[in-house]
Swiss-Prot record:
Acts as a regulator of autophagy in response to S.aureus infection by promoting activation of LC3 (MAP1LC3A, MAP1LC3B or MAP1LC3C). Acts by interacting with ATG16L1, leading to promote a functional complex between LC3 and ATG16L1 and promoting LC3 lipidation and subsequent activation of autophagy. Modulates the O-glycosylation and complex N-glycosylation steps occurring during the Golgi maturation of several proteins such as APP, BACE1, SEAP or PRNP. Inhibits APP transport to the cell surface and further shedding. It is found in: Late endosome membrane; Lysosome membrane; Cell membrane; Golgi apparatus membrane. The keyword Transmembrane applies. Pfam families: BSMAP. The chain crosses the membrane at residues 239-259. This is Transmembrane protein 59.
Amino acid sequence: MAAPKESLWVRTQLGLPPLLLLTMALAGGSGTASAEAFDSVLGDTASCHRACQLTYPLHTYPKEEELYACQRGCRLFSICQFVDDGIDLNRTKLECESACTEAYSQSDEQYACHLGCQNQLPFAELRQEQLMSLMPKMHLLFPLTLVRSFWSDMMDSAQSFITSSWTFYLQADDGKIVIFQSKPEIQYAPHLEQESTNLRESSLSKMSYLQMRNSQAHRNFLEDGESDGFLRCLSLNSGWILTTTLVLSVMVLLWICCATVATAVEQYVPSEKLSICGDLEFMNEQKLNKYPASSLVVVRSKTEDHEEAGPLPTKVNLAHSEI
């Protein structure tokens, strides 16, 4: 216990980061209980440790420092991933390698630590994919089921306001009309109640026999139900299908109306243009005869000579005049 505490105190005096100190403390032989407590949070590094043992076997590398450096690189990567929330694994790898460079001064131990960071990367990616697969995903039919539930709730709330009643109109002897209105009441006949009890007893007696057959029938149903499962699903969930069909039909009708208005040809009737020879064309159409030149009488009026008016008086400037 003294050696890890002394090494931890030395690293603290040297100013190493707290993240690295935590890794070195967990990697020690006396911190197995603490390491197991952090495994559930930081992730499993056993596969990375086995890869380090295969890379640095003790019969080939008699020194244990490189093996421990590789295993600490695995743990460093897990801690960096926990700090960064696993957003970018490439960035986590760079942070792990920089921590290895700060922790080890010898090149062999630095390389072993970097190798541990590299070995932990594929296992971290696999763990991230597994966590993403466990996250709940929204089904494609979830919006339709949501609309169906909303529609059913709205219909139930609307039916709660609807009340049924009986109304009777009677006419008295004096001619007055009397109206009786009351809510319907359900009355059970005694012989029907007795029949219902008999049916209940007979149904209970048949349940034991039907349960044995249902177990076998249910097994056969599961085998044969795969073929008609889609049709059965449609028959059971026809409400939201009808609602969806109605909504889509309304949307298609609106789209057709808008498209027709936008692409319709303008109904423009051009006005008839006036022609200079319109009178002549009219005469030709009506087959009218022209008047001869001798039948035309030219009346000339004698123009009267008018004397021209005299010149206008000269302009007088009122500002220079005295009144």
